[in-house]
Amino acid sequence: MTLINRSKPFVLLVGFSIISSLLLWVSQASVVSSGDFNKDFFVTWSPTHVNTSNDGRSRTLKLDQESGASFSSIQTFLFGQIDMKIKLIRGSSQGTVVAYYMSSDQPNRDEIDFEFLGNVNGQPYILQTNVYAEGLDNREERIHLWFDPAKDFHTYSILWNIHQIVFMVDQIPIRLYRNHGEKGVAYPRLQPMSVQASLWNGESWATRGGHDKIDWSKGPFVASFGDYKIDACIWIGNTSFCNGESTENWWNKNEFSSLTRVQKRWFKWVRKYHLIYDYCQDYGRFNNKLPKECSLPKY
């Protein structure tokens, strides 16, 4: 992994520590499903714009003037960890949106979003994250990544448990959303969610507020997905089972209720050098009355 120069002394100091720390998060997993898109997912929009490798290990979505495309997991889940490797659109990608997310698909839906907002050639992608809880959203954060996400595959992860939601890029935490339900803050905790991905035309808003439109002469636009892992509680109608702590539900254990010391340092590094928008800093948007969670601890 190549990081910006100003961070290199930090990387050298903690490189070994973060690897050791992150292995703890991964090593306790008992994989629910891993690898075959044909077995674990189904196409939800425009099958002609979805291409899956013969072995089912990789899948691409295509966007052209006719259509975008999407797919969804067959199962739904209540808590767990989801990892997906993604390679974004190269070159002129302005106006395009690649989304990877979990959603309950209900009117008052819960949703946990990664949205990759394309840009003109030579300008960086914006990664927007969002959390819907009981139908309420407006919780966007945006960062610039420290690498070119269209050059190679990178792993984007969601850890969702009874304590917190952690968004991760290559196992580095970039955003936290804690369960402050006891203080009146909505948190996704009752609705099972499917894992979904899509590629679509977002030129009305995605790049510079809709100023930069899709250049269709550069299409078709292709995003690639692969090497996913779903280690989560499969929904069978039993909320108490998925809420519990057990060997299978490792993510709910107390050790995953907050970040480790090393992860906190990485999180602060991302916030300092790569954060470009945080709804909790947008006083104008909320008429100087920020959402309650903005005044509560992040970890």
From Swiss-Prot:
<keyword id="KW-0378">Hydrolase</keyword>
<feature type="disulfide bond">
    <location>
        <begin position="280"/>
        <end position="294"/>
    </location>
</feature>
<dbReference type="InterPro" id="IPR010713">
    <property type="entry name" value="XET_C"/>
</dbReference>
<feature type="binding site">
    <location>
        <position position="115"/>
    </location>
    <ligand>
        <name>xyloglucan</name>
    </ligand>
</feature>
<dbReference type="GO" id="GO:0016762">
    <property type="term" value="F:xyloglucan:xyloglucosyl transferase activity"/>
</dbReference>
<dbReference type="InterPro" id="IPR044791">
    <property type="entry name" value="Beta-glucanase/XTH"/>
</dbReference>
<dbReference type="InterPro" id="IPR013320">
    <property type="entry name" value="ConA-like_dom_sf"/>
</dbReference>
<protein>
    <recommendedName>
        <fullName>Probable xyloglucan endotransglucosylase/hydrolase protein 10</fullName>
        <ecNumber>2.4.1.207</ecNumber>
    </recommendedName>
</protein>
<keyword id="KW-0326">Glycosidase</keyword>
<dbReference type="GO" id="GO:0030247">
    <property type="term" value="F:polysaccharide binding"/>
</dbReference>
<keyword id="KW-1015">Disulfide bond</keyword>
<keyword id="KW-0325">Glycoprotein</keyword>
<feature type="binding site">
    <location>
        <begin position="138"/>
        <end position="140"/>
    </location>
    <ligand>
        <name>xyloglucan</name>
    </ligand>
</feature>
<comment type="function">
    <text>Catalyzes xyloglucan endohydrolysis (XEH) and/or endotransglycosylation (XET). Cleaves and religates xyloglucan polymers, an essential constituent of the primary cell wall, and thereby participates in cell wall construction of growing tissues.</text>
</comment>
<dbReference type="GO" id="GO:0042546">
    <property type="term" value="P:cell wall biogenesis"/>
</dbReference>
<feature type="site" description="Important for catalytic activity">
    <location>
        <position position="113"/>
    </location>
</feature>
<feature type="glycosylation site" description="N-linked (GlcNAc...) asparagine">
    <location>
        <position position="51"/>
    </location>
</feature>
<dbReference type="InterPro" id="IPR000757">
    <property type="entry name" value="GH16"/>
</dbReference>
<feature type="binding site">
    <location>
        <begin position="204"/>
        <end position="205"/>
    </location>
    <ligand>
        <name>xyloglucan</name>
    </ligand>
</feature>
<feature type="disulfide bond">
    <location>
        <begin position="233"/>
        <end position="242"/>
    </location>
</feature>
<keyword id="KW-0732">Signal</keyword>
<keyword id="KW-0052">Apoplast</keyword>
<keyword id="KW-0134">Cell wall</keyword>
<feature type="binding site">
    <location>
        <begin position="128"/>
        <end position="130"/>
    </location>
    <ligand>
        <name>xyloglucan</name>
    </ligand>
</feature>
<dbReference type="InterPro" id="IPR016455">
    <property type="entry name" value="XTH"/>
</dbReference>
<feature type="glycosylation site" description="N-linked (GlcNAc...) asparagine">
    <location>
        <position position="238"/>
    </location>
</feature>
<dbReference type="GO" id="GO:0004553">
    <property type="term" value="F:hydrolase activity, hydrolyzing O-glycosyl compounds"/>
</dbReference>
<feature type="binding site">
    <location>
        <position position="285"/>
    </location>
    <ligand>
        <name>xyloglucan</name>
    </ligand>
</feature>
<dbReference type="GO" id="GO:0071555">
    <property type="term" value="P:cell wall organization"/>
</dbReference>
<keyword id="KW-0808">Transferase</keyword>
<comment type="similarity">
    <text>Belongs to the glycosyl hydrolase 16 family. XTH group 1 subfamily.</text>
</comment>
<feature type="domain" description="GH16">
    <location>
        <begin position="30"/>
        <end position="225"/>
    </location>
</feature>
<feature type="active site" description="Proton donor">
    <location>
        <position position="115"/>
    </location>
</feature>
<feature type="signal peptide">
    <location>
        <begin position="1"/>
        <end position="29"/>
    </location>
</feature>
<keyword id="KW-0961">Cell wall biogenesis/degradation</keyword>
<dbReference type="Pfam" id="PF00722">
    <property type="entry name" value="Glyco_hydro_16"/>
</dbReference>
<feature type="active site" description="Nucleophile">
    <location>
        <position position="111"/>
    </location>
</feature>
<dbReference type="GO" id="GO:0010411">
    <property type="term" value="P:xyloglucan metabolic process"/>
</dbReference>
<keyword id="KW-0964">Secreted</keyword>
<dbReference type="Pfam" id="PF06955">
    <property type="entry name" value="XET_C"/>
</dbReference>
<dbReference type="GO" id="GO:0048046">
    <property type="term" value="C:apoplast"/>
</dbReference>
<feature type="binding site">
    <location>
        <position position="209"/>
    </location>
    <ligand>
        <name>xyloglucan</name>
    </ligand>
</feature>
